[in-house]
């Protein structure tokens, strides 16, 4: 919810979200002339600020009548998973048409640190676009990974985290909210 930043603001450090709220632009009533359809279409709308007719994402898969084949939004046989041989990771943003906020930020401010972390690759890649660091959970290994499109190796901090097997430990724990819902 939009008001969650205000509601939970005292729990955040002075950097991060609180810095964005203090120094950034804050829209309290913004909307797009668009009806939510599927997750990849909605994520592309959020990450590009454009509607599907502009950003070109219609689903996570579609049929290309010209090429007479099914196309995946993120699957890309030219790429591989980094530090994992199970096949998951053959992904890239090559089928994304529009520039994302991350792409624009990288173009305007090349020294920016841009990272997207998600549970699965579709969300991570669609939100990031072509720029920055992109990581997702490789569920078969309970490890974080990325695509060779973004990096040839995992940064040391992620490799170290994966080596410690903390994800398996978290996977079996029951999640409970630290704060009350209301």
Indicate residue ranges for each PLM-predicted region.
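Active-site-proximal N-terminal segment of extracellular/periplasmic enzymes that hydrolyze or transfer
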Residues: 1-24
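Extracytoplasmic/secreted envelope proteins and their assembly/folding machinery
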Residues: 2, 14-17, 40-44, 59, ...
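Extracytoplasmic/secreted cell-surface and envelope-processing proteins
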Residues: 2-6, 39, 124-128
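Second-shell loop/turn segments in exported
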Residues: 2-8, 32, 86-92
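Short helix C-cap/helix-to-loop transition motifs enriched in small/turn-promoting residues
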Residues: 14, 26-28, 52-56
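Short, solvent-exposed turn/loop segments enriched in Gly/Ser/Thr/Pro and often Arg
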Residues: 27-45, 116-125
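His/Asp/Glu-rich, glycine-adjacent segments
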Residues: 50-51, 56-182
């Amino acid at each position: 919810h939009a008001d969650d930043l205000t509601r939970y603001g005292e729990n955040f450090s002075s950097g991060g979200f609180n810095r964005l709220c203090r120094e950034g632009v804050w829209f309290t009533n913004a909307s797009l002339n668009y009806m939510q359809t599927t997750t990849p279409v909605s994520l592309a709308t959020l990450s590009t600020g454009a509607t599907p007719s502009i950003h070109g994402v219609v689903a996570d898969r579609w049929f290309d009548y010209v090429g007479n084949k099914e196309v995946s939004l993120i699957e890309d046989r030219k790429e591989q998973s980094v530090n994992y041989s199970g096949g998951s990771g053959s992904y890239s943003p090559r089928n994304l048409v529009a520039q994302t906020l991350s792409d624009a930020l990288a173009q305007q401010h090349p020294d920016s640190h841009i990272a997207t972390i998600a549970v699965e690759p579709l969300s991570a890649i669609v939100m990031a676009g072509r720029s920055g660091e992109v990581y997702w959970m490789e569920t078969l290994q309970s490890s974080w990974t990325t695509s060779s499109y973004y990096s040839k190796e995992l940064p040391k901090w992620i490799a170290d985290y994966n080596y410690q097997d903390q994800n398996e430990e978290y996977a079996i724990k029951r999640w409970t909210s630290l704060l009350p819902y209301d």
